[in-house]
């Protein structure tokens, strides 16, 4: 990505941020706290409020510094002193969102701080006008069609300054943001990497870089600075790339070295458990986080997703009311209320709140995906497709949006499109059985039964959360008249259901017992056939067949019909599914490249 020469060349410009240097590890927490307090002030001066808040929260989690260790603010340069009046006035206008006015009074300033605020004010002015035009003239699904008209001018000016080595770490960050907005991804990555070398303490640059990394291979080729901030970046990107085990190891390491009181790290761990669907663990961590930081709004939409999945209506209602009292105009609050109405099956109201969230922040990923789900519930497939596509525009790593598009095209009976989107979802979540089952169903519809069998088998091997894969595989074997394999799958399905203490509410349980009863009957295994037939009598849809089969077995026994001599034990575990030959070993590697729409 960014060449070392370019990093060195830009490093000379970093002198505009005096005193900002980092240590490579966590051996000196006092020094790290000083750095965090310093960068919190520097980002606040430049209007980078989210980065300032992140740094301040992290600093707060570390032990307090003695008076002798507290550092004074960096001294003013000659250029800063000349621009101090214009900067002070412009910053006041900036803080009340009068961006054009701020830029007007900063025009011609020479200090790097004033220059950054001048360019950033112009950028935010363009963003504000774009959002205002979007809200006034178009529905929320059309946001991507309105552009920030200031971007091209900003790119030309920042590029000229960059070539002249006149950008400090903050200027590089803004240049990268402009490039990303213009979809110049490779150039943006190079610039963000430079920004992390020049000013490694600025979390905003790391976060922007994180949003552009699409896979682990891409991450390997980045030339990143050797600093403790890199550990926070890696933990975050691992979570985003669904590499949850690696992410949790990183966060545990950060806790061990001294950040155990960081609400940011605790929330990220909860998000990681949410991503691997360890719902109980994630709920427990979020509840503990709410006790420690009761007015926190960040990540509460993720917490509401967990409450939604568990159908915890009263808890979700309490959370929605609580967040409304704190700040009802936050994006996360709107998403929580949307989830609350969705759980109550009031999908029109839910979609309305997700639209409100998007008016507040058009790039808020969760709202696009959740709105797509609501449109699916309302059978509005065209609107759902638009919403999911916008989610992918915001973040191509969002497997839920790819999966949602697959479901939508499945409803529209367009299997080739459906296959493409399910494959993209599977690439992002290779060990998620839901993606594999969906792929298998798609291959079935395309009559690619070998690929379908691979998918169902793999879904079972990685841990079938919905208990569907074995039944679907069994039915596929039935269709191919592979009776022994079908019986093995049904037996394993029954054993799995009973071993985990499931009730008899599974829809396919009666199907499994009916097939096994008939299979054992054909094999003249009267005891096993009789056991399965008796089980069939417990279900309404198979009761009569079970009784009829029991009568036939009794009649054949009375006639002296003898069972087969090689009778296995009841509900035997076939060798192919035994503990010493697990499904994971038998399943062939999944090749999903055979069909390309």
Swiss-Prot record:
Residues bearing the modification Phosphothreonine: 562, 582, 596
Q: Which Gene Ontology terms describe the biological processes this protein takes part in?
A: anaphase-promoting complex-dependent catabolic process; cell division; protein branched polyubiquitination; protein K11-linked ubiquitination; protein K48-linked ubiquitination
Which modifications occur after translation, per UniProt? Phosphorylated. Phosphorylation on Thr-562 occurs specifically during mitosis.
Where do the TPR repeat units fall? 27-63, 73-112, 114-144, 169-200, 229-259, 263-293, 297-327, 331-361, 366-395, 400-432, 433-466, 468-500, 504-540
Q: Which residues carry this modification: Phosphoserine?
A: 578, 588, 593
> Which Gene3D superfamilies does the entry link to?
Tetratricopeptide repeat domain
Concerning PROSITE patterns, the annotation shows:
TPR, TPR_REGION
Residue(s) carrying N6-acetyllysine: 467
> Position of cross-link Glycyl lysine isopeptide (Lys-Gly) (interchain with G-Cter in SUMO2)?
147
Q: Which residues carry this modification: N-acetylalanine?
A: 2
Pfam families, per the entry: ANAPC8, TPR_11, TPR_8
What SUPFAM superfamilies does its record include?
TPR-like
What InterPro entries does UniProt report for this protein, alphabetically?
APC8, TPR-like_helical_dom_sf, TPR_rpt
Transcription among keywords: no
List the keywords (alphabetical): Acetylation, Cell cycle, Cell division, Isopeptide bond, Mitosis, Phosphoprotein, Repeat, TPR repeat, Ubl conjugation, Ubl conjugation pathway
Is Acetylation found in the keyword set? yes
Complexes and interactors: The mammalian APC/C is composed at least of 14 distinct subunits ANAPC1, ANAPC2, CDC27/APC3, ANAPC4, ANAPC5, CDC16/APC6, ANAPC7, CDC23/APC8, ANAPC10, ANAPC11, CDC26/APC12, ANAPC13, ANAPC15 and ANAPC16 that assemble into a complex of at least 19 chains with a combined molecular mass of around 1.2 MDa; APC/C interacts with FZR1 and FBXO5. Interacts with FBXO43; the interaction is direct.
Identify this protein by name. Cell division cycle protein 23 homolog
- Organism, as annotated: Mus musculus
């Amino acid at each position: 990505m960014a060449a070392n020469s370019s990093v060195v060349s830009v490093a000379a410009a970093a002198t505009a941020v005096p005193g900002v240097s980092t240590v490579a590890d966590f051996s000196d927490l006092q020094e790290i706290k000083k750095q965090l307090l310093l960068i919190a002030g520097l980002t606040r001066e430049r209007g980078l409020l989210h980065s300032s808040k992140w740094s301040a929260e992290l600093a707060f989690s570390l032990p307090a510094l003695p008076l002798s260790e507290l550092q004074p603010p960096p001294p003013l340069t000659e250029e800063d002193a000349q621009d101090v009046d214009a900067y002070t006035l412009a910053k006041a206008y900036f803080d009340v969102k009068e961006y054009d006015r701020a830029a007007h009074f900063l025009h011609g300033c020479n200090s790097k701080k004033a220059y950054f605020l001048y360019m950033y004010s112009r950028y935010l002015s363009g963003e504000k006008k774009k959002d205002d035009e979007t809200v006034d003239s178009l529905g929320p699904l059309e946001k991507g069609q309105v552009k920030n008209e200031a971007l091209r001018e900003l790119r030309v000016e920042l590029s000229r300054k960059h070539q002249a080595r006149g950008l400090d770490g903050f200027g590089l960050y803004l240049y990268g943001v402009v490039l990303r907005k213009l979809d110049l991804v490779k150039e943006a990555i190079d610039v963000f990497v430079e920004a992390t070398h020049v000013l490694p303490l600025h979390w905003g640059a790391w976060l922007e870089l994180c949003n552009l990394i699409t896979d682990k291979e891409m991450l390997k080729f980045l030339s990143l600075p050797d600093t403790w901030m890199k550990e926070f970046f890696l933990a975050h990107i691992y979570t985003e790339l669904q590499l949850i085990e690696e992410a949790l190891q990183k966060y545990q390491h950060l806790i061990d070295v001294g950040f155990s009181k960081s609400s940011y790290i605790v929330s990220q761990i909860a998000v990681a458990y949410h991503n691997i669907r360890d719902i109980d663990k994630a709920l427990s961590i979020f509840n503990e986080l709410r006790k420690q930081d009761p007015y926190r709004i960040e990540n509460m939409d993720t917490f509401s997703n967990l409450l939604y999945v568990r159908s915890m209506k009263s808890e979700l209602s309490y959370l929605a009311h609580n967040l409304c009292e704190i700040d009802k105009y936050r994006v996360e609050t709107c998403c929580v209320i949307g989830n609350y109405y969705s759980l109550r099956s009031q999908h029109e109201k839910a979609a309305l709140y997700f639209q409100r969230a998007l008016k507040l922040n058009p790039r808020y990923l969760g709202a696009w995906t959740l709105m797509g789900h609501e449109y699916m519930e309302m059978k509005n497939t065209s609107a759902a497709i638009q919403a999911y596509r916008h989610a992918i525009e915001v973040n191509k790593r969002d497997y839920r949006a790819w999966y949602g598009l697959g479901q939508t095209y499945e409803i529209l009976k367009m299997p080739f499109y459906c296959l493409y989107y399910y494959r993209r979802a599977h690439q992002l979540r290779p060990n998620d059985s839901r993606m594999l089952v969906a792929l298998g169903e798609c291959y079935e519809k395309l009559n690619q039964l070998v690929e379908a069998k691979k998918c169902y088998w793999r879904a079972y091997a990685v841990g079938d959360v919905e208990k569907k894969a074995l039944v679907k595989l069994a039915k596929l074997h039935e269709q191919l008249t592979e009776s022994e394999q079908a019986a093995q799958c049904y037996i394993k399905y029954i054993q799995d259901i009973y071993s985990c203490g499931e009730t008899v509410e599974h829809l396919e349980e009666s199907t499994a017992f009916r097939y096994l009863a008939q299979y054992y009957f054909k094999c003249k295994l009267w005891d096993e056939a009789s056991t399965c037939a008796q089980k069939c009598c417990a279900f309404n849809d198979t009761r009569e067949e079970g009784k009829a089969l029991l009568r036939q077995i009794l009649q054949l026994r009375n006639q002296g019909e003898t069972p087969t001599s090689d009778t296995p034990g009841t509900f035997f575990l076939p060798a192919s599914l035994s503990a010493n030959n697990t499904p994971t070993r038998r399943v062939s590697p999944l090749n999903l490249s055979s069909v390309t729409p």
